[in-house]
Amino acid sequence: MKNVLPPFIEIYRALIATPSISATEESLDQSNASLITLLAGWFSDLGFNVEVQPVPGTRNKFNMLASTGHGAGGLLLTGHTDTVPFDDGRWTRDPFTLTEHDNKLYGLGTADMKGFFAFILDALRDVDVTKLKKPLYILATADEETSMAGARYFSETTALRPDCAIIGEPTSLQPIRAHKGHISDVVRVLGQSGHSSDPARGVNAIELMHDAIGHIMQLRDSLKARYHYEAFTVPYPTLNLGHIHGGDASNRICACCELHMDIRPLPGMTLNDLNGLLNDALAPVSERWPGRLTVAELHPPIPGYECPPDHQLVEVVEKLLGTKTDVVNYCTEAPFMQTLCPTLVLGPGSINQAHQPDEYLETRFIKPTRELITQVVHHFCWH
């Protein structure tokens, strides 16, 4: 099978050269169809059965599932096909041209995380996938950088239940078994405009929001006091006020005010519980000013995630790498994969390069990543 696929670096180059930006702004958002076509062709060449799945609610985006083998269990290797937008003024290289310099591979998606598929393909090029004793699945998802729509849709619709999954996000090959979730909400206050010379004739939305923020700060303190997970560097749920806007003139009573905030819950905290806590915190303001305060989601929420520390996947990967699993504060698609099977986040490159100008992956990751993929496939699909 050695001659079926292009060389590793050419696969990498083709992936980086195929734009697949995800953005909430429609003018920047791109389909990942061309990238999915590339991947589907290569995995078909290796003998995989390939299914391309349109993702509802997206702008022409797709998941790809490549599968081989029969029966229950097996291994799922997964990652997302999209990247964030890039700031052209801050890049010193063409983001869509793979450039090797000073033991680094530069390009948009080299670390986060289109390059991971080049590693999978390269590791499998010498494997006769028809001889695996358990199934091997490769999932390429859409829209991770915005809504995680691809992972959500796959987890809600698939009947697959592998023994375990590995998501190849850039972790510097440090296995991650837990991370926090993310909830982003908008708090809106509707006041009543009027001339500032007669405050009694209006309802100042900024003043109501000031009251609401006081209660939100009390909730922040309560979350910090009540919930604790010492493995995290920030061992409690965080609550951040990120953006506020209200009013239009100094001599006008403010008619509306809007606050954007986020909460990063610990694993095990349910989204319903957090929504209830936020609504309870704001209840005094709502009762005092009926109909003037609302809370809504800015983005679909992401729950916290945790793989059981005593699971076989953790034991095997820790032994292969000679290192213990860790936890992180950022989010991945792991909560959705975890609904199917125990999941670890583990991949080449550094998270510090994600979403940065002149993104790169150090070439020192190439050999150990290829070896790791070969070893986990051998362990979970041949034993």
UniProtKB/Swiss-Prot annotation:
Reactions accelerated catalytically: N(2)-acetyl-L-ornithine + H2O = L-ornithine + acetate
Cofactor(s), by name: Zn(2+); Co(2+); glutathione
Similarity comment text for this entry: Belongs to the peptidase M20A family. ArgE subfamily.
Active site: 82, 144
Cofactor remark from the record: Binds 2 Zn(2+) or Co(2+) ions per subunit.
Keyword annotations of the record: Amino-acid biosynthesis, Arginine biosynthesis, Cobalt, Cytoplasm, Hydrolase, Metal-binding, Zinc
Record-listed Zn(2+) 2 binding positions: 112, 145, 355
Top-level taxon: Bacteria
Record-listed Zn(2+) 1 binding positions: 80, 112, 169
Gene Ontology CC: cytoplasm
Organism: Salmonella paratyphi A (strain AKU_12601)
Entries under InterPro entries matching the protein: AcOrn-deacetyl, ArgE/DapE_CS, Bact_exopeptidase_dim_dom, Peptidase_M20, Peptidase_M20_dimer, Peptidase_M20A
Protein's name in the database: Acetylornithine deacetylase
GO molecular function: acetylornithine deacetylase activity; zinc ion binding
Self-association and partners: Homodimer.
GO biological-process terms attached to the record: L-arginine biosynthetic process
Pfam entry (one): Peptidase_M20
Cell compartments where the protein resides: Cytoplasm
Pathway in which this enzyme or protein is active: Amino-acid biosynthesis; L-arginine biosynthesis; L-ornithine from N(2)-acetyl-L-ornithine (linear): step 1/1
Described function: Catalyzes the hydrolysis of the amide bond of N(2)-acetylated L-amino acids. Cleaves the acetyl group from N-acetyl-L-ornithine to form L-ornithine, an intermediate in L-arginine biosynthesis pathway, and a branchpoint in the synthesis of polyamines.
Enzyme Commission code(s) on record: 3.5.1.16
